[in-house]
């Protein structure tokens, strides 16, 4: 099957009809307005414009808002600005909108943070002090992340995307798991996605545990149950790209890893597929032929419930993935299926069946633009083109609440404001 996908003659390929999945995002609008010499294309635009472009021009099923520095720690001084941006975006958008950032525990070490750098301490053979520094940093990471998301959730965010969990090793994952646990305890309706930084959790500390399981050395199929136990709705497994090997080799390895993670996970899996992970080549402008083949293989062979679109230019990442395997958001029913995955932890098949039943259509109709265009207009649940008088933003989402039998956080905020 994988060989067939790789050898298809077309430049772009796509999943078979009916196998489409919802997409989530890393890096938010930075791929549009960012210009740091990586994958951002430097278009001067507001984040509202960036988010709405993903919703209405790219056909994204979900989107996220993120700070230009894209880590939780730098958000603290400007959290009020982030909250205002979130409120404005939620008033104008229909698809689920997350707040995304990296836990990035490295920012808590000198010279950027208050704790001694474990790397420097380990070079001096001060192993116990290095471990102590990691433990303190993890505590601060948990505290800061929870505090930031308390503010953002109060401003209408649908949820949070923890991007590159474990980037600083097992301490980073430890702090993130406890942040997820705290947020789930406080906010039962918050959508929580936890995407990993790498395929294996690096044992920088080596002895940290969560729920009795040592974090160091965990692989994707072992990470998934812990992320679910902490309280996440969706897990984002990773398989690293080996830049010394071919795309075919990397994709075969990635599909093998992710298929095992999907099988072991009690919650939906949105495989991370930015440049350098998930069988995607390490290039700022990811080749479209490689991206669409990887996208198709992850859906049809690994059986993922969704794809987390990562770093890469707009053409090479969101547009290519959505064309290959996405549900095209409010062009069809992608946002509705995504909401069921996040609000009820439904796997892709169950989510599609639930939404199709609520709409009174066949599952194949969920990605039929003609059927869904008429149905969305009739039900007033938000349409991709601008029609005077049609429900938009909060109004459309209130109708979605009634249709799906769920509560949407931005609608709850609006109801409180007019009470």
From Swiss-Prot:
Annotated pathway: One-carbon metabolism; methanogenesis from dimethylamine
Superkingdom of the source species: Archaea
Alphabetic keyword roster: Methanogenesis, Methyltransferase, Pyrrolysine, Transferase
Catalysed reactions, semicolon-separated: Co(I)-[dimethylamine-specific corrinoid protein] + dimethylamine + H(+) = methyl-Co(III)-[dimethylamine-specific corrinoid protein] + methylamine
Keyword presence, Metal-binding: no
One example GO MF annotation: dimethylamine methyltransferase activity
EC number(s) given by UniProt: 2.1.1.249
Similarity comment: family membership: Belongs to the dimethylamine methyltransferase family.
Free-text function comment from the UniProt entry: Catalyzes the transfer of a methyl group from dimethylamine to the corrinoid cofactor of MtbC. No evidence for expression of this protein has been found after growth under presumably inducing conditions.
Name the record gives this protein: Dimethylamine methyltransferase MtbB3
Lineage of the species this protein comes from: Archaea, Methanobacteriati, Methanobacteriota, Stenosarchaea group, Methanomicrobia
